[in-house]
């Protein structure tokens, strides 16, 4: 407990077979990267990293030792992944350097490295006329020159008149055009029947109305006659009853 305030630096080396294999892979990767960097002209050389663990307390528990070993294993795995990336990196870096050199030779001093290739653009498609842009800004469509013409310019003054007779300018050698068939002439009887048929068709409804009215009037007259007969019978019956009552009263008075 006396050495609690002291700080001790310890270098922990792998003791298991897996850790030794990882170290061998790291050494082989470092040699490959040095060879590739020397061939491509790059001065970047990976340096093996040592893991230094600083412990403030001299007495460490077993859990802390296990945690430190896990940290070392993750460090070795990270080194392996970095070595595998560095082996594939030189080819891509070389191609990017070639592209940058090509851009500098062409004299492009812009910051962006994007250069579209094999693209043919028509300069006329990049801008519009002032009238079209003005119409689009107002939400309108540019009119055609034909639409802007006046009514008299577009149509002749006599376009509504019927077609002229071409008989005056007809060439005598040309055959005349066929006319439509002429309707047959009707005789007097046919004409009279047609007229009557037309009259009947036109006067059919009023005739039917008059016939209906006549039937209705006849029915009303029959009803009136029946009602009159019934009334007469009732009056006769009442008169007979009165006579019978009067005669019976007189007969009774005479006997008494």
UniProtKB/Swiss-Prot annotation:
Biased composition regions of type Acidic residues, renumbered to the chain: 1-14
Misc note: In its host, LCK protein is inactivated, preventing T-cell transformation activity.
Native source organism of the sequence: Saimiriine herpesvirus 2 (strain 488)
Domain writeup: The SH3B/LBD1 (SH3-binding) region binds LCK SH3 domain and CSKH (C-terminal Src-related kinase homology) region binds the kinase domains of LCK. Both motif are required to activate LCK.
Function: Plays a critical role in virus induced T-cell transformation. Binds to T-cell-specific tyrosine kinase LCK SH2 and SH3 domains, thereby activating its kinase activity. Once phosphorylated by host LCK, forms a complex with at least STAT 1 and 3, resulting on the phosphorylation of STAT3 and presumably STAT1, and their migration into the nucleus to induce transcription of target genes. Stimulates host ILF3/NF-AT-90 activity. Association with host NXF1/TAP transduces the signal up-regulating surface expression of adhesion molecules as well as activating NF-kappa-B activity.
Biased composition annotated in UniProt, kind: Pro residues: 174-183
Spans annotated as CSKH/LBD2: 146-155
Any one GO CC term of the record: membrane
Protein name: Tyrosine-protein kinase-interacting protein
Residues modified as Phosphotyrosine: 114, 127
